[in-house]
Each structure stands twice: as C-alpha cells, then as structure tokens.
A protein has these predicted regions:
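Conserved N-proximal alpha/beta basic substrate-recognition cap immediately N-terminal to
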Residues: 10-123, 274
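C-terminal active-site "lid" helix and adjoining low-complexity regulatory extension at the edge
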Residues: 17, 249-275, 279-286, 293-334
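Active-site nucleotide/adenylate-binding loops and adjacent lid/helix of ATP-dependent enzymes
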Residues: 79-199
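Extracellular structured ligand-interaction cores
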Residues: 128-130, 187-191, 204, 286-288, ...
Length: 334
C-alpha cells in the first residue's frame, strides 16, 4: 500500500503529462510497445523504487533484473546521505558563507561577505572590472549574478547587492583556455563525488563535466547545460546529455566543438584537491564537489551535501548497462 502511495505521489509531483511525455520518449528511442513500457515503468517503481525519469535515464527499457539491481536509486541515495552525513553539519555546505570560511585555502580566490560592512567590499572592488555575486543559500545556478563595474560607484553596487540579498562577492574565475573550448560563456565545472570510507579513506566514486549551453553564464543542468561522465583519467568518452532538450551531443550545439576525446586539464590535481577537502569535515562523508580548472590548476567552486545519483548512471555512459551501486558500496567499506 505504501508503494502505491509513493508511486502516485511521484507521478503527481512531476505531473501525469510529464509521465506520458517520458513514456513517449522511451518509446521513440527504444521502439518498444507503449503498453509494455507503461507496465514496466509501473513495475519498476514497485520492484526497484525508481521513478519514470530514472527509468529513462538508466535505460531500464534495455536491461533486465540482474543489471537493474546494480543501480543506485533515489531512496538508496537518501539513505546514504543519512548514514554518512550528520544533519547538524549540513550548514557547512548549505550556506556558502560557511563553506567559504571552512575551505578558504581551496577556493584560491578572494571573496568578501557584504554583511561584514562596506569597507571590506570597497577594498575588494579596487581595480576590478567584474566579479560574481551570490546568495549564500541557493541552488541550481540560481541566486548568482555577474556584476560588471563599468565605472559605477562602489557604494551604489554595494547597496544594490544588499537589496538583492547577494551577500557574497567573489573574484571572477578565469577558466583554463582548454576548458573554455567546451563553452566560452560559462565556467565549465567538474563534479567530483567523494565518499570517505568507514576506515577514513577518501574515495572518488565518479567525476562528471558540466558544460554550458552557450547562452548563460552558468553550466548547471537545471539552467540548460549538459553533462557527461569522465573516464578515470579525466577524458570525455561518451556524448553529453542535455535534460532541457533531451538530446545527446557529440559536438557542442552552439559551437560545433567536438566533445569526444577532450581531456580535462589538471585532472589528477582536481582529484587530489577533492580528496583533501573530503577529509576536512569528518561528519560529512558523502559530498559532491564542483571544481573549476584555471591556468594555474583546480579551484573549488562549492560542495554539495546531496550529490546526484542519477547523472553518473545515464545509460549512454555505460556500455555494459550497469549502474554504480557497487562502486558506492566498495567506497564505504574500503
């Protein structure tokens, strides 16, 4: 009975319209009968605990029970967060002002909290043509604004940002020229998911690169960007997926730049930075780190205490049709 309630709650939360839209997309991609797919989607909810979005992302239309059991589900992910991350430490990652203080040396760029007063902001502004302002608590690329000084008075900008509650001002990250080839209008970040084992060892479970769409200054998936899984040595080996267009790209749609074979600069250093960061807050053992790559190496953008489980399990990134649940289990136990 509980699973029936969960099923209808999840369908209703995304709307029946979206449910059938996804059903149609899976039908078009797989060529399978709509009724068969509908029944299997409902069955998968009860048997494996996945919603219709994950059904499409994981490619469940193409695989059977043994491989379906290798996937991390939403419930698995929530259970892992509850097990590995202590709620009273969430603020470290929910509030960027707290995060920035904790990991200041890994940010590797100056920033200022406007709530500390105008004088600090005025000093930060000296000689700057632009910078980024952020809400301390915001998600998905929202609450972020690129500020162009353009001769304006520092006091005017300060009051404007205070009014908009964009309390954090930080130096604009200038990404590595190679990373700029992916998309020049946004800083294209690497998402590195770390798990600290029961023995205190940091492990990288997966790494993704997120690429801007070309018309916004952020690379977030919710803002129209795309993503793809990286190989162990930091290469793009599979097409990038865009949720907004429900399309896989081997070339960037705005520039035509070929994605397959691209090597992330300073990838080893980025992994080392994330492992270092993973050990800094012992009560938060499961974190997704957003890393930017500059000419001088990797810098931290932010950390997330609810890392995604779905993106790294996109079926187009795994030729063997398997999920990464075993990778998480290994990381926890070793």
């Amino acid at each position: 009975m509980d699973k029936i309630k969960v099923f209808f709650r999840r369908v209703a939360s995304g709307s029946f319209k979206r449910f059938f839209r996804n059903l149609e997309l899976v039908h078009e991609e797989s060529g399978k009968n709509r009724i068969v797919l509908f029944v299997d989607m409902v069955y998968s909810m009860f048997r494996y605990g996945i919603g219709y979005l994950d059904y499409m992302t994981f490619g469940f239309a193409y695989i059977k029970r043994d491989k379906r059991l290798t996937f991390m589900t939403m419930d698995d992910n929530i259970a892992m967060v509850r097990r590995l991350n202590q709620r009273d430490s969430y603020e470290v990652f929910d509030d960027k002002s707290v995060l920035y203080r904790k990991f200041k040396d890994l940010l590797k760029r100056p920033y200022v909290d406007l709530r500390d007063g105008f004088e600090g902001f005025a000093a930060f502004m000296e000689g700057r043509e632009n910078f980024f302002a952020k809400e301390p608590v915001s998600y998905g690329g929202l609450g972020v604004k690129k500020v162009t000084v353009d001769g304006r008075d520092a006091k005017e900008i300060y009051e404007e940002l205070m009014e908009e509650k964009l309390f954090l001002a930080e130096e604009t990250i200038v990404q590595h020229p190679e990373m700029k080839k992916l998309c020049s209008s946004s800083v294209n970040t690497v998402r590195v998911c770390t798990v600290v084992s029961d023995n205190g060892n940091p492990h990288v479970v997966y790494a993704l690169v997120r690429i801007g769409s070309g018309d916004k200054a952020v690379d977030n998936i919710s803002s129209g960007g795309m993503y793809t899984l990286l190989s162990k040595d930091g290469q793009i080996t599979h097409p990038a997926f865009c949720d907004k267009t429900v399309t896989y790209y081997t070339e960037h749609p705005a520039t035509g730049f070929k994605l397959i074979g691209f090597q992330i600069p300073y990838f080893e250093e980025a992994i080392a930075l994330c492992k270092q960061a993973a050990l800094r807050e012992p009560t938060m053992r499961y974190i997704g780190w957003d890393i930017a790559i500059t000419e001088n190496g990797p810098v931290m953008v932010e950390g997330n205490n609810l890392p995604g489980y779905d993106m790294p399990q996109n079926h187009r990134f795994h030729d063997d049709g398997r999920g990464i649940k075993e990778d998480f289990e290994y990381a926890i136990s070793h």
